[in-house]
Amino acid sequence: MDDKKNAPSSDKSKALAAALAQIEKQFGKGSVMRMEDGAVVEEVQVVSTGSLGLDIALGVGGLPRGRVVEIYGPESSGKTTLTLQTIAEMQKLGGTCAFIDAEHALDVTYAQKLGINLSDLLISQPDTGEQALEICDALVRSGGVDLIVIDSVAALTPRAEIEGDMGDSLPGLQARLMSQALRKLTGSINRTNTLVIFINQIRMKIGVMFGNPETTTGGNALKFYASVRLDIRRTGSIKSGDEVIGNETKVKVVKNKIAPPFKEAHFDILYGEGTSREGEILDLGSDAKIVEKSGAWYSYNGERIGQGKDNARNYLKERPDLAREIENKVRVSLGVPELGAIKSDEPVAKKASAKESKEAKELKEVE
């Protein structure tokens, strides 16, 4: 009786082995493998967003490499600031970054203030949506770029629309362009471990009586292909006397394929400075009992670092090593990976290089 039960499973194993052999013969070794055989299961590599609270809300300590990310929100909510800070963080790790400025509105002086090394930043200002996405595809396939930002999806105007008359109706053209581009891009993005961030704008659906009337431009393809979607909103103003010096900002993780979604982060964006990272370190550090707060005084390891939040923030800004030490302790206490301080001349290690070295080793063994 047992032999009869085992016979079908034995036949299935033989059929599977034959199918795998055929696939490897046709498409090459490693086209299909068991999860435990190769380096398929890897820890997700991330890059910080420049906001400690948002890194923690993302669940893995930052934005994932080898994935598509969408950041959307109303005008002047901090979308471009967030991506520029991410570029600065990637450059600190020794990565190469590119900014595809479809809106033709990048403020180079502001980018420099946020810590971006302009001499290492690739920038493109394409004429059409097709040109922008072709440039993105070429950069991703090269394997030499670690982070690409496209600002924004709404500005990716199809060539037919630019060449046509002002009143021409061309329904679905941009959506088809995005759908085709993302089908081509996703495979090479994962293979080369490149992080691609799309900035998007919000539009209103006409005639919606119930539910949220807001939607993003460029159709539904980006919603599906994005591993992380961030909704960024301005919730208030920061004032110094009567002068407005920044925005209070809320970011909601609307979609997250690598950690639980729907978490929120609240932080301040100061004009000309970006996210108040040191302020977040003090707030989250005192919540985690890593930074002691007694009255108006902030202390760390028994040593006073400032009276009042502004003084303590300036103290940490002047001592980035101490700020990084406190931040990493906060990250560990909240179960998020620490930030590395390594910077090399070469781009951050690629998945492809590890795969190539493994294939070379196997080839050597065969020879």
Curated annotation (Swiss-Prot):
Residues 345-367 are annotated as: Disordered. Keywords: ATP-binding, Cytoplasm, DNA damage, DNA recombination, DNA repair, DNA-binding, Nucleotide-binding, SOS response. Gene3D superfamilies: P-loop containing nucleotide triphosphate hydrolases (3.40.50.300). The keyword Nucleotide-binding applies. One of its GO terms (cellular component) is cytosol. Transmembrane segments: none annotated. The keyword DNA damage applies. One of its GO terms (molecular function) is ATP binding. GO terms for biological process: DNA recombination; DNA repair; SOS response. ATP binds at G73, P74, E75, S76, S77, G78, K79, T80. Its main location: cytoplasm. It is found in: Cytoplasm. It comes from the Bacteria. PANTHER family: MITOCHONDRIAL DNA REPAIR PROTEIN RECA HOMOLOG-RELATED (PTHR45900:SF1), RECA (PTHR45900). HAMAP family: RecA (MF_00268). Belongs to the RecA family. Can catalyze the hydrolysis of ATP in the presence of single-stranded DNA, the ATP-dependent uptake of single-stranded DNA by duplex DNA, and the ATP-dependent hybridization of homologous single-stranded DNAs. It interacts with LexA causing its activation and leading to its autocatalytic cleavage. This is Protein RecA. It comes from Janthinobacterium sp. (strain Marseille) (Minibacterium massiliensis).
